[in-house]
Amino acid sequence: MSDYPDGLTVRPLTTWPGDLTSPADRRVSPFAATLGTTLSALDRELAAIQARNPVMEVAIEPCQFRIDGRPRARAAATHPGVVLSLPMTSVGPLRYATDRFLSWQDNLAPSCWAWRRCGRSRGTALPAAVSSTPVFERCHLVATPGR
């Protein structure tokens, strides 16, 4: 069983911000991490940016959540998109959404490493608005010198 970060609210995603990536354009994730490893990284990154009241939205039906608010082990998402909303951080409110990869678990991983590459190591935070460019590609644009 995977340990979700303390204080993280996980809830069903009711509305995707923008257009979903077409299934034909989704790809296999270049990140080789288990959900447990990704959740540990998420916990570290949330602590590093002093995130309070983080919310993760996943396209899982409400009936597939356990009593404690976590998705059941065999919960199936209707699409792989994941939205992370961080209303209170040391760099201001942040919101990330991506559906580039085949599973929501794989889409969660880039957000964890993108925070380090963007806001934490470069001192630049992305705005709370969501764009169609995946978070790790947006961070590359922000963090690339000369841009």
Language model: regions and residue ranges:
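Short "pre-J" leader segments immediately N-terminal to J/J-like domains in DnaJ-family
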Residues: 1-146
